[in-house]
Amino acid sequence: MGTYKKEKSRIGREGANEKKPGNLRVKGENFYRNAKDVARVNMYRGGKAKYNAAGELVRAAEFQSSEVPKARIQPDRRWFNNTRVIAQPTLTQFREAMGQKLNDPYQVLLRRNKLPMSLLQENTEIPKVRVLESEPFENTFGPKSQRKRPKISFDSVAELAKESDEKQNAYEEKIEERILANPDESDDVMLAARDAIFSKGQSKRIWNELYKVIDSSDVLIQVLDARDPVGTRCGTVERYLRNEASHKHMILVLNKVDLVPTSVAAAWVKILAKEYPTIAFHASINNSFGKGSLIQILRQFASLHSDKKQISVGLIGFPNAGKSSIINTLRKKKVCNVAPIPGETKVWQYVALMKRIFLIDCPGIVPPSSNDSDAELLLKGVVRVENVSNPEAYIPTVLSRCKVKHLERTYEISGWNDSTEFLAKLAKKGGRLLKGGEPDEASVAKMVLNDFMRGKIPWFIGPKGLSSSNDEINSSQKVATQQTEGSDQDGEEAEEEWHGISDDGKADESESTKPVAEGSASESTDESAVDDNKNRS
C-alpha cells in the first residue's frame, strides 16, 4: 500500500469529526526536519575547506564564506536631514524666558535632556580677548609682521591705571576682611596647629560618602539647626550643586524648631525660602511637626519625575543636625541609629519611605572654613565633647552666647563674674571636687558643653534686622529661647521674658516673645511647604 493510501486510511480511522484532524502528508514531503535542521545538514554535506600545496584556500567551507552582501541605506529624510533645529530669534526668546525662571526655587524644569542647555547658558566668566586692539592684523601677518608688542588687555595708559587701582582696592578689601575675621591675629604671631579632633567630618572617606549620596539622589534635603541656620549651612555643597548638578533639587529643612520660638522660626523660614524651599521641622516619632509638609513636597517631586520608576532623596548636613532622626520620623519607627553625639552615622544607608520614594542617610560633613574657630566648631556639635582637651577654655564662649538668667534658672546658681568662678560654683553645687576640695573644672565644663549643644541651656542666633523689621515681625518680638523637650516649667517661668542674640553675636537686651510649648504647631499645606507665622496646634 502506498504512502498516500496509508495517510488517507489513518485519517478515516481517527474520525472526521475531530476538531483538529491530522494533516494529510504526501510522499516526498520532508516532515521530519525543520529549516534549521536542513541548514545544519547542508553545512555538514558541504565538506571541509580545500587548500592547495602552498596552503592557500582554494574553496571555502559552507561556514567560512567571507563574502558580505552590499548594504544600502534607505534614502530617508530621518537619517540625512537635521532633526532638532531652532532659529536664532526663537533661541533668544527662549533664553530670556529661561533666565527669568531659572533662578526661581519654585520652578522646576522638566525634560532637560531635550533642550540645548549649552546654548541657553552663556559662559560670561571668561573675558573676551581683544586681539585686534592689542595686536593689529598688519603687525602680525604680512611684510610688516612683528610680535614685539606685549599682549595686553587695555588700549591706553588710563585703562592701565584704572585696572591697577581696581586690583589694589580688591587686595585691600581682602586684607580688611582677614583682619575682621581674625582680630587677634598679627603678622608677628604664628597660629598653633589645630587639634586633629577639630578636623572631624572633613576626611576623604566622608566626602566620598557625600558624593555617593549626591550622585544617587534626585532631591537633596539639607538639614539645618534652627538655633544657628547660617552656621550649619554647607555653602560648598550648594555651589557644587549649582554649578555641576543644577538638575538636582534642593530643600532646606529647619530642624529643632522646638528649641526656638515661633517668631524666630518664621523669620528664618522667610529668609531661607528666597533661595530654596524651606520647611520648619521637629523630629519626633510620636510628636513631630512639619512631617506632613515634607511628605507633601516629596510627593510633588515624585509626580514631577513621573518618567522614573522611583526617586531618591538624600539627606545631607552637619553632624548631629538630625538627619537620621528625620528619617525615623518619616517612617514613624527606628530604622536608623541615632545618638546625641556627632559621628553616629558612618556610611550611607538606603531607606524605603514609600513605593516611589527612597531616602538616603548620609554621614555628617563639615566644609572646611578658615573663619570657623575651634570654639565655633565645638559649639556647632561637630566634635564629641569627651574627646576635647582643656574643655574649660570654651566656657567663656558659652557664657557670651547665653543670658545670665537662663544659666541661673538652669543650674540654680548665681553671682559669678567669670567662667572660672562659674565652674567653681557649679562644681561645688554638684559635688564634683578633687583632692583638697578643688573644683573639677574639666568634668563640669564637659557637662556644660553637652547641655549647651543638646538644648538644655536656651540659646540661638537670630536673623539680622529682626528687631527693626516692622512689616512681618513686631520690633518687640526679638530673638527668643526655649528650653529643651521635656523640661518642666511652671506658670511663672512661662510668663518670663526671653532674650537671645542677634546674628552679629551681641546679646539682645530688649523685650522678646514668650516661649512656645513643645509640639504646639500647625503644619502648613501650601505649595511651597513653607511655614509662616501660624500658631502651633
Curated annotation (Swiss-Prot):
Residues 497-512 have a biased composition (Basic and acidic residues). One of its GO terms (cellular component) is nucleus. Residues 487-496 have a biased composition (Acidic residues). The keyword Phosphoprotein applies. InterPro entries: G_CP_dom, GNL2_CP_dom, GTP-bd, GTP-bd_ortho_bundle_sf, NOG2_N_dom, P-loop_NTPase, TRAFAC_YlqF/YawG_RiboMat. Residues 468-486 have a biased composition (Polar residues). Its main location: nucleus. Keywords: GTP-binding, Nucleotide-binding, Nucleus, Phosphoprotein, Ribosome biogenesis. It comes from the Eukaryota. GO terms for biological process: ribosomal large subunit export from nucleus. Residues 1-24, 468-537 are annotated as: Disordered. GTP binds at G317, F318, P319, N320, A321, G322, K323, S324, D361, C362, P363, G364, I365. It is found in: Nucleus, Nucleolus. The modification Phosphoserine is found at S186, S487. Transmembrane segments: none annotated. The modification Phosphothreonine is found at T484. It holds the Pfam family MMR_HSR1. GO terms for molecular function: GTP binding; GTPase activity. Residues 207-368 form the CP-type G domain. GTPase that associates with pre-60S ribosomal subunits in the nucleolus and is required for their nuclear export and maturation. Belongs to the TRAFAC class YlqF/YawG GTPase family. NOG2 subfamily. PANTHER family: GTP-BINDING PROTEIN-RELATED, NUCLEOLAR GTP-BINDING PROTEIN 2. This is Nucleolar GTP-binding protein 2. It comes from Schizosaccharomyces pombe (strain 972 / ATCC 24843).
